[in-house]
Amino acid sequence: MSYRFSLAYLTVMDATPPEAVQIAAACGYDHVGLRLLPAGNESPFPLLSDARLLRETRAVLQDTGVTVADIEIVRIGAQFDPQRYLPLLERGAELGARHVLVAGDDDNLDRCAGHFARFCELAVQYRLTADLEPMPWTGVKNVRDALQVIETAGSGNGYILIDALHFDRSDSTLEQVAAIAPGRINYVQFCDAPHIDNPTLEQLIFTARDERMLPGAGEIDLKGLLQAIPADTVLSIEVPRKAEARHLSAQQRAQQGLEALKRLIG
């Protein structure tokens, strides 16, 4: 089976967008993920407004043949206004991106679905999909919640994004993943981590954003997850390792992540 691989932003978060593309090409990735808006309260990333950086990034994409799989990140809260994400969508289209990573911060799932549908209406104008990622500390906590939002929204370009870490630390099951309608998953984020019973909010967020493990080095059932997803799913390596970044370059970390996942696949 021939998989396609994408280098996620968090794996090489210390690299600039052009550097991330170059690293992806050097390591043998097919795609790259780029962050334009922050996950927290930081300022927007330079790629969103810096025309020179956009030109440099597009030039490297063209030179290497690497393509942008996804851009990050849209957060849907109770007061969500999709119009404020127009600059993100426009930039994504200029980069040739395919997917937008979406987080659901509203635990009123019906309201979240309405907002998700409105965002999908905008995204489709830029030939982008909206890929909803359940995270256990957000309003959309698990696979069940995400599917409810997507199905209620009823948008043709609305998809679910599975993150191996969040899958493992929520009450989601492999059976739920395997039952997802064909064509509703574009990509899955792979990493590993130790098993923790009843993790705290701080543990959930710290591991997710700072210290994950290479695929195969922890206790997540990654082989089971591979078997549960469609064969044409893009596999994204999302392995932030801030401690190891002190002595390993971004390219070394990207290479290790890809090699680890390929070993797991066999």
Positions of predicted regions on the chain:
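Active-site acidic/histidine proton-transfer and metal-coordination neighborhood
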Residues: 60-67, 75-159, 169
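N-terminal small/glycine-rich loop or linker at the start of catalytic domains
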Residues: 1-6, 67-70, 74
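Histidine-acidic metal/acid-base catalytic patches
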Residues: 1-9, 13-31, 58, 62, ...
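Active-site beta-loop-alpha junctions enriched in small/polar residues
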Residues: 8-12, 35-39, 73-76, 104-107, ...
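Surface-exposed, active-site-proximal loop segments in enzymatic domains
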Residues: 41-48, 74-89, 202-209, 245-246
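Glycine-rich, proline-tolerant flexible connector loops at the mouths of alpha/beta enzymes
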Residues: 33-56
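Alpha-helix-loop-beta-strand connector modules within alpha/beta enzyme cores
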Residues: 50-69, 121-126, 220-227
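Hydrophobic residues within beta-strands of alpha/beta enzymes
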Residues: 32-33, 71, 100-102, 130, ...
